[in-house]
């Protein structure tokens, strides 16, 4: 069991900023991520992927170049979901790499697992192969969000999907 000045739960934008800033102020910091990858919803299924998909669609469809080359201009005639996700995945993976490098450069300890409180200053972290406990003077809970699924909207993960289902959508997306 190690003692930290700050433990952070969640590696999304809020957790990242809290951990990095505390480390830059000379504090001993640890951060816990429940998923197997850093970045939270923003990096993995939300903001960055959705904007990357949009930009890929605009580029491949030639939308921005049509004023120069005419209304029928396209970079690629038949655009597939694979074409769109290729660029999005590149951007996502680069962002994950940046986040991990920031943590390493600032000496922030990173664990992948599920954090739970034993008491106000002690966390249990259940990892894939073991359990560890750490104490901290302060704990920041930055556990993120999930897509809203209002009960009156019939999400079926085929015709109506949220951002969590988008990257698993496959080629059928263009048949809808």
Q: Where on the chain are the PLM-derived regions?
A:
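Beta1/beta-strand and adjacent pyrophosphate-binding region of the FAD-binding site
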Residues: 1-14, 172-176
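The conserved SAM/SAH-binding core of class I Rossmann-like methyltransferase domains
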Residues: 9, 32-33
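Short alpha-helical segment within the catalytic ATP-binding CA
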Residues: 17
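Glycine-rich flavin
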Residues: 2-4, 20-27, 33-173
């Amino acid at each position: 069991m190690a003692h930290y000045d700050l433990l952070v739960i969640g590696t999304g934008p809020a957790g990242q900023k809290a951990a990095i800033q505390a480390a830059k102020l000379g504090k001993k910091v640890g951060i816990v991520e429940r998923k197997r990858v850093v970045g939270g919803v923003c990096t993995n299924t939300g903001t960055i992927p959705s904007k990357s998909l949009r930009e890929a669609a605009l580029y491949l469809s030639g939308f921005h170049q049509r004023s120069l080359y005419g209304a029928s201009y396209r970079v690629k005639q038949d655009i597939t979901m694979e074409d769109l996700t290729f660029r999005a995945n590149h951007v996502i993976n680069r962002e994950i790499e940046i986040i991990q490098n920031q943590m390493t450069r600032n000496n922030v300890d990173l664990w992948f697992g599920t954090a739970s409180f034993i008491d106000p200053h002690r966390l249990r972290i259940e990892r894939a192969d073991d359990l560890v406990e750490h104490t901290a003077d302060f704990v920041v809970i930055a556990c993120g969000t999930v897509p809203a699924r209002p009960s009156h909207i019939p999400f079926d993960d085929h015709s109506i999907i949220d951002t969590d289902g988008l990257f698993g959508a496959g080629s059928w997306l263009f048949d809808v």
